[in-house]
Structures are given as C-alpha cells and as structure tokens.
C-alpha cells in the first residue's frame, strides 16, 4: 500500500497493528436464558469486560515497548467495552498512532423498543509520529449497517432488533 506523507513523497509501507482479545463470546454475551434480562444479554459481561480492558492495555504497552509504534492500531468489532473510549484516546495520544476500534453494543433509543446499534470509534491524535497535525485529538464514530448472520440470529433469539447505522466517512490525510 502506498500513502502520501507530509513531504509529498509516497511511503513504501503502512504499519498496522491488530489487537485481538481472547474474549469468549459465549461468556461475554450470555443468552437471555442465562441472564433473564435482554439488556444484560447484549452487554459484555463484567468478567469479560475486565479481561478485555486488561488485554488491550497489555497489548498496547507491549507495542509501545518495541519502540516501533504503528501508524494505525485496529481492534475488531465488539472488542472494546463501552466506557473505555477515553482510555483509548489517551493511548492513541501517547503512542501517536491512529486507533480504529470496534465498540460493544449500545441501547438505541427507548429501552422498550429493544433496539441496539453498534459502532466503531476512529481516534486521530493531534500528533502522529512526532509531528503535530492538529490542535486537538479528533474522534469520529462510524456506525455499523449490517450485523453478521450469526450475530443477527443471536440478537433475534434475544428479542432484540439491530438498528442500522449507514454511515460512510472518507478520511484523507497528507500526514500518513
């Protein structure tokens, strides 16, 4: 992949780190029969949430300790518990790397409607690779439009409807 650097030159490489936590999906998102409450079934369990946060911190620390910070850090969909966004922003700023992370489900509107949505967060720190590119760190949310078939089936069995978020963002940078 070639990208334009701030110098106008084409870079030969884009460094990307992918962090995959070891969440157990069945433990993280328990069935309605296990929880008795659909809201609990669509939220990551507290045990798996603690594990996910710990693993994310550990992986990011390990990456930082290599001395070779990536241009972009990816965390797949549903990998990041809700409420962990501020820590991700601080980590992106500390590492001077863009972070694209998939967040856990969130309730969509009136709880009586039993609707959930899913988003990712894109964090662009004000500094990339030692170079200031903006006056402050920017965050954007990108909505998910279609759930995977197995995901949609599990939500259906829980009595929950998936709210589509047909969002398209185009990111352009002369600094990468």
Place the predicted regions along the sequence by residue:
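Active-site catalytic loop in hydrolytic enzyme cores
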Residues: 1-4, 113-176
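N-terminal, active-site-proximal structural segment of metallo-dependent hydrolase catalytic domains
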Residues: 1-72, 78-79
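A generic secondary-structure signal marking the coil-to-beta-strand transition
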Residues: 12-17, 96, 138, 176
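Hydrophobic alpha-helical segments
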Residues: 29, 34, 85, 90-91, ...
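Cys-nucleophile CN-hydrolase/nitrilase-fold catalytic domain and related Cys-dependent amidase chemistry
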Residues: 47-142
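Short, low-complexity, polar/charged sequence segments that are solvent-exposed and flexible
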Residues: 35-40, 92-95, 159-162
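Active-site beta-loop-alpha junctions enriched in small/polar residues
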Residues: 21, 104-106, 145-147
């Amino acid at each position: 992949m070639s990208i334009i650097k701030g110098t106008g030159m084409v870079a030969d490489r884009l460094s990307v780190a992918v962090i995959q936590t070891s969440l157990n999906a069945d433990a993280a998102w328990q069935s309605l029969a296990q929880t008795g409450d659909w809201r609990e079934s669509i939220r990551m369990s507290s045990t798996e949430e603690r594990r996910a946060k710990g693993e994310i911190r550990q992986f990011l620390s390990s990456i930082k300790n290599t001395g070779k910070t990536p241009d972009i850090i990816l965390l797949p969909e549903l990998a990041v518990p809700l409420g962990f966004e501020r820590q991700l922003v601080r980590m992106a700023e500390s590492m001077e790397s863009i972070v694209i992370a998939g967040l856990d489900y969130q309730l969509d509107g009136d709880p009586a409607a039993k609707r959930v949505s899913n988003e990712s967060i894109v964090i662009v720190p004000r500094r990339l690779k030692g170079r200031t590119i903006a006056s402050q760190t920017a965050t954007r949310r990108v909505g998910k439009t279609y759930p995977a078939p197995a995901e949609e089936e599990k939500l259906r069995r829980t009595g929950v409807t998936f709210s589509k978020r047909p969002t398209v963002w185009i990111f352009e940078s002369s600094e990468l």
